[in-house]
Amino acid sequence: MAQESNENGWGDFLELCSKIKTPEAFHDFFALFLTFGERESMASRFLIVQALLAEQLTQREIAQKYGVSIAQITRGSNALKAIDPKFKEFLKNLNRKYGNQ
């Protein structure tokens, strides 16, 4: 029962996220639901994935540039390996579009 409730909660959370349209609203939303540490972890994960998608830096260079551990980079790399190739290409295109190469 608890797992079903959590799955419904996650789906509802994602649905609510899809309704947010401005960076300011996202900031307020995530400030409500995530601690400072969780937001910092999410920001680090974003930078790691962004750098991995750009394929311009080694893992060691990413670690030095962003002050993250090799283990964090490995987790990001493994997550990218596990996603659908079409979604990965979508992310790469977004990365290029917004000048984050």
Curated annotation (Swiss-Prot):
Protein's UniProt keywords contain RNA-binding: no
Gene3D superfamilies: TrpR-like
PANTHER family assigned: TRP OPERON REPRESSOR (PTHR38025:SF1)
GO molecular-function term, one example from the UniProt record: DNA-binding transcription factor activity
Major localization class: cytoplasm
Cited function: This protein is an aporepressor. When complexed with L-tryptophan it binds the operator region of the trp operon and prevents the initiation of transcription.
GO BP term (any one): negative regulation of DNA-templated transcription
Family: Belongs to the TrpR family.
Domain of life: Bacteria
GO cellular component: cytoplasm
InterPro entries named among the record's database cross-references: Trp_repress, Trp_repress_bac, Trp_repressor/repl_initiator, TrpR-like_sf
Pfam families reported in the protein's UniProt record: Trp_repressor
Taxon lineage: Bacteria, Pseudomonadati, Chlamydiota, Chlamydiia, Chlamydiales
Key words of the record: Cytoplasm, DNA-binding, Repressor, Transcription, Transcription regulation
Protein localization: Cytoplasm
Name of protein: Trp operon repressor homolog
Keyword Transcription carried by entry: yes
DNA-binding residues (ranges): 59-82
Assembly and oligomerization: Homodimer.
